[in-house]
Amino acid sequence: MLEVKKISVKVSPILFFSLLALEIISCNTPAQKAEIPPNIVFISIDDLNDWVGFLGHEQAITPHMDQLASKGYSFTNAHCPAPVCGPSRTAVLSGLSPVTSGIYDNNIKFSRDLPKVVTLPEHFRNNGYQVYGIGKLFHGGASNVPKAAFDLYGGKSGSAAPFTSSELQNSKQDPYHLVTKGGKTFKLPLNGMPADRYWNKSHTFDWGPVDLPDSLFSDRQSVDWAIDQLDDIKKEPFLLALGFERPHQPLFNPKRFHDLYPLDKASLPDVPENDLIDLPHRAKQLALYPRTSGRHQTVVKYGQWENAVSSYLASVSFVDELIGDLIKALEQHRLIDNTWIVLWSDHGWHLGEKSHWGKATGWYRSTRVPFLIVPPMGQKQFKKSEQVKNMVNLLDLAPTMADIAGIPKSPKWEGRSLMPILKQEAENWEEATLTTFSIGSHTISTPHWQLISYFDGSDELYDMVNDPNQFFNLAQQPQKTQMINQLKKYIPEESRWNYFIRYKDYKILVPKKGDIQVFDQILEGRNDEDIAAEVPGLVKKILGYIEENKPQQKKFTIDVL
């Protein structure tokens, strides 16, 4: 039998209280540190495609973003919920997909369209965070920022800087006009191209160096404001949200950034001569019409392709330098050890791929986005320089950030928390993600395939492993029918609608309740411009066609009425 003996030890009063103090410190200090919620710096970048160093672009000079990628997680298969500013940002900041929110275009005002939705920054405020915001976060400028979103909002949303929107008006730039800034005179448009996006009031499809102080550019002003808040923050935890305007057009930047990319060194995207030949009718329209930017043929005609590529990369490098300034300030304020950094772009941007400029398409150049999550430097349990290949979506931001902060997630949010991936605990991850580029039109992206399904029932299918530039549409191959049908299972039902119909150049939506809506399909994404009242004869014929034929398919084209 084991014998247990009592041992008595005499301890001096000084030693006793010293040991007691050590016990109190050892018990309480780590717990107190663990109880301090982390800060989050939330960085959005407008119109940034995957032309960054950490995603493999050979010319992009982005040392600060690359350094962030080396300290955290870079998601190499991240896609946007919508390839246009308004619906993508609405999805991120509401946690709701375009199909759920009904926001498919840039005609968005939260107070009018989503008055009951608690936005992501407001959710953090409601859960004990001090929330600061500056720059382009919500679409539509400072007037569209919900009052409850931030404790303090600094404004500064305006992509025209250093010029004003008035100075970029089409009527003033036909063919050009002179603007004086900082004692210097500029001839606009800088690229010498005429505006061919006629419906837009401002001629922003322009680029080139602007030799003015950084302080005249809104992104520089936004970063300076954000850094100033770090000086004044009295309470943690905080969420600091910073929205950059560049590389949104016009691609105007301080001259030194353009000097980084000589025109004779510009590497242009590969655009085969007959690249559009295997596309459906709707896709060709989407490629060629200058909805969000100008025409490819205009860029080529005026010899501006190299200049545009150089200016886009200059914009990216300008933003990168500003990000570096913010990170340096976090380090100087000794906040870096308890601050997560989340960096994302609202969607991609074409620079001639598919003969298209701008965004708003279903191709990967519009849907793929840079996305970084960088844990605090003091948290060693997370890996560094981890390239994550799982399919993820910007809708995943809201639940992920809630998990990072240790606050409740809204049951209405539709994304998936990425915390299991960050902790290497993700099992059975669904490797497919959805991008919606208009009512009834969607892209499904997987590691191997990208399916683009249009409202009229036409499709594109690309093998992203063997054809990453999407040169060969495989949708018409009979052996791919099963794959297409399998991918279409990820497309939402959109139960509000009975039919999506294309007739000539009209897009027709037939709801289960209410009146038929008719749109000019060339401007398909502008779903606020219903012209049904202007074409009553067409509406009558469509109703007659449906009554007579009782279509079984939800999406189809009518050739003759």
Segments (PLM) and residue ranges:
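Formylglycine-dependent sulfatase
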Residues: L2, K10, C27-Y454, S458-D459, ...
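Short hydrophobic beta-strand that contains or immediately precedes a catalytic carboxylate
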Residues: L461-Y462, V518-F519
